[in-house]
Amino acid sequence: IYEPEIA
């Protein structure tokens, strides 16, 4: 699952 606000 990719999280757009992980950085």
From Swiss-Prot:
Subcellular location per UniProt equals: Secreted
Instruction: Tell me which residues bear Alanine amide.
Output: A7
The domain of life for this entry's organism is: Eukaryota
Q: Which GO terms describe its biological process?
A: defense response
Sorted alphabetically, the keyword list is: Amidation, Amphibian defense peptide, Secreted
Q: In which tissues is it expressed?
A: Expressed by the skin glands.
**Is Secreted included in the keywords of this UniProt record?**
yes
- Main location class: secreted
One GO cellular component assignment for this chain's record is:
extracellular region
* Oxidoreductase is among the record's keywords: no
Could you tell me what this protein is called? Electrin-5
* Classification lineage: Eukaryota, Metazoa, Chordata, Craniata, Vertebrata
